Regions:
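Alpha-helical transmembrane segments of integral membrane proteins
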Residues: 34-44, 90-307
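Hydrophobic alpha-helical transmembrane segments of membrane transport/permease proteins
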Residues: 2-4, 41, 49-87, 244-253
Length: 307
C-alpha cells in the first residue's frame, strides 16, 4: 500500500468506526493493567469532587469558627456537622476546602495545558511547514524562554500581572508552549513532503486545510501523551506558586495555599493541615504520570506489546 493509500485509509478510520474499535481495545488493555485503572479511577473521583464540590462540601470553605480552630479530624462542627478532616487555624473545614481546591487545581491544570498546547501546536505547525525566517523566529523565541528558569519567569509575570486564576492560567500556559512547538515542528518537517500531503496539494487544498486537516491529525498521538504529563507538571507549579503566595487570591482555596497555611501549625503537631492537601497533590500528579506512561506505551506501535 502506498503512502497516499495509507493516508486516505487513516482519514477513513478517523471519520468512520475506527476510533470506536481503538477505544474498545484501549479499554480492554487498560482493564488488564491495574495501575492505569486505579489512576483513572482516582482522576474521576477528583473530577467529581471538582465539579460537584459545592454540593458535596458540608461547610462553606471560607466560613470561620475561631472557637473550633485547629480541631482534630472527626470533631463535631457547627449546625450538627462534622469536621471530617479537622479544621485549620481559622476554624475552616479542611474537607470542604480540599473539595473546592480540587476545582481550582484541576481547572488551572487543564486550562493552562489548553492555552500552552494551542499556542505551541500552532507555532510548531507554522514553523515546520513554512520554515525559513518564521521557523528561525519561533525557535529562537523558544530558546530565549528556556534560558530562564520557569518558576522565576512565573514569579516575575505574576508580580506584574497580580494574582488571579486567569493570570495564573495564562502564565502557566505560556510556560508550556515551547515543548509542544518543538515536537510538532519536528513531526511537521517529516510529514510535509510525504505523498499524502503532496496529494492534498495536487487536489488544490488550501494551505490552512493541509496544515490543520491533513498534517495535524497525524501528530496528535504523541501530543496526548505529553499533555497528560504536563497537566501533572502544571498542577505542581500551581501548588508551588500558591505556596509562595503568588497564585490565586487568598480567599480562594487551593491545595498549594492549604499547604502554605499549614507551615505555622506543623510544630504544634497539627499534621492534618499538611498531610491531606499534600496527599491530594501527590496522588493527582502520580495518577497523571501513570496515565501518561500507559498512553505512551499504548500509542507507540513498538511498545504496544508491553501494554
Amino acid at each position: 500500500m502506498s503512502e497516499i493509500e495509507r493516508g486516505v485509509a487513516a482519514h477513513g478510520d478517523v471519520r468512520g468506526s475506527g476510533w470506536r474499535s481503538e477505544l474498545q481495545r484501549a479499554s480492554r488493555v487498560m482493564v488488564a493493567a491495574r495501575w492505569p485503572v486505579l489512576a483513572v479511577a482516582f482522576l474521576l473521583f477528583a473530577a467529581i469532587a471538582a465539579v460537584f464540590g459545592g454540593w458535596l462540601a458540608p461547610f462553606d470553605p471560607n466560613r470561620q469558627n475561631l472557637v473550633l480552630r485547629l480541631a482534630d479530624p472527626m470533631t463535631s462542627g457547627p449546625d450538627g456537622g462534622v469536621f471530617l478532616l479537622g479544621s485549620d487555624a481559622l476554624g475552616r473545614d479542611v474537607f470542604s476546602r480540599l473539595l473546592y481546591g480540587a476545582r481550582v487545581s484541576l481547572t488551572v491544570g487543564f486550562a493552562a495545558i489548553t492555552v500552552g498546547g494551542t499556542i505551541g501546536i500552532t507555532a510548531g505547525l507554522l514553523s515546520g511547514y513554512f520554515g525559513g525566517w518564521l521557523d528561525d523566529l519561533i525557535m529562537r523565541l523558544g530558546d530565549i524562554q528556556l534560558a530562564f528558569p520557569f518558576i522565576l519567569l512565573a514569579i516575575m509575570f505574576l508580580v506584574v500581572l497580580g494574582s488571579g486564576v486567569w493570570n495564573l492560567i495564562i502564565v502557566l500556559g505560556i510556560g508550556q508552549w515551547v515543548t509542544y512547538a518543538r515536537i510538532v515542528r519536528a513531526d511537521t518537517l517529516s510529514l510535509r513532503e510525504k505523498e499524502f500531503v503532496e496529494a492534498a496539494r495536487a487536489m488544490g487544498d488550501s494551505t490552512f486545510s493541509i496544515i490543520f486537516r491533513t498534517i495535524l491529525p497525524n501528530i496528535l498521538a504523541p501530543l496526548t501523551v505529553i499533555a497528560s504529563f504536563n497537566v501533572a507538571s502544571v498542577i505542581l507549579s500551581e501548588a508551588a506558586l500558591s505556596f509562595l503566595g503568588l497564585g490565586v487570591p487568598p480567599e480562594v482555596p487551593t491545595w498549594g495555599s492549604m499547604l502554605a497555611e499549614s507551615r505555622d501549625t506543623l510544630v504544634a503537631n497539627k499534621w492534618w493541615l499538611a498531610v491531606f492537601p499534600g496527599v491530594a497533590i501527590m496522588l493527582t500528579v502520580l495518577s497523571f504520570n501513570i496515565l501518561g506512561d500507559w498512553l505512551r506505551d499504548f500509542l507507540d506501535p513498538r511498545l504496544r506489546e508491553r501494554t
